[in-house]
């Protein structure tokens, strides 16, 4: 079932690129990121409330909170740079570069989480990087 969620994530990420490119025309990208963040904030808290997630907030550990905050900072910085790149570049070039994050995540998961680097993951990461380079050059 994870693949269905991943596929939906990919679909919405693709829509994000298109909607963002149209929405940031003539707009300060920092303001655009702030607006996007407010929408996500309301949506995420609404989902957490209606699905009962808020009732488990007391189970969060200090480590959970620290790393969720670090993840939020990384996400925010990613969005800021992504919107700026979309404002001045083509979606067909910006999106593939952004998706190189998959290859970077594989490497970081190996370094920090001890996830194995198999021939399959190395070849897949190199194909992602190669495909991205083909699309942008």
Segments from the language model and where they lie:
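Membrane-interface interhelical linkers
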Residues: 1-11, 27, 41-67, 79-88, ...
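Helix-helix packing/entry segments at the starts of transmembrane helices
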Residues: 31-38, 86-105
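Structural signal for membrane-spanning alpha-helices in multi-pass inner-membrane proteins
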Residues: 20, 44-51, 82, 109, ...
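C-terminal transmembrane-helix exit sites in multi-pass transporters
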Residues: 103-122
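Hydrophobic/small/kink-forming positions within alpha-helical transmembrane segments
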Residues: 10, 14, 18, 45, ...
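Hydrophobic/aromatic residues within transmembrane alpha-helices
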Residues: 23, 32, 85, 111-113
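Hydrophobic transmembrane alpha-helices of multi-pass small-molecule transport proteins
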Residues: 120-136
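Juxtamembrane helix-loop-helix junctions in multi-pass membrane proteins
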Residues: 15-39, 57
């Amino acid at each position: 079932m994870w693949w269905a969620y991943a596929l939906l994530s990919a679909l919405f990420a693709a829509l994000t690129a298109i909607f963002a490119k149209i929405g940031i025309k003539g707009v300060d990208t920092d303001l655009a990121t702030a607006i996007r963040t407010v929408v996500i904030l309301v949506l995420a808290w609404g989902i957490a409330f209606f699905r009962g997630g808020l009732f488990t907030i007391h189970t969060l550990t200090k480590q959970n909170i620290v790393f969720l905050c670090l993840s939020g900072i990384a996400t925010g910085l990613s969005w800021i740079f992504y919107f700026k790149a979309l404002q001045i570049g083509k979606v067909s070039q910006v999106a593939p570069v952004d998706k190189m994050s998959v290859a970077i995540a594989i490497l970081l998961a190996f370094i920090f989480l001890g996830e194995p680097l198999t021939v399959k993951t190395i070849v897949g990461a190199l194909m992602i990087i190669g495909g991205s380079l083909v699309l942008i050059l």
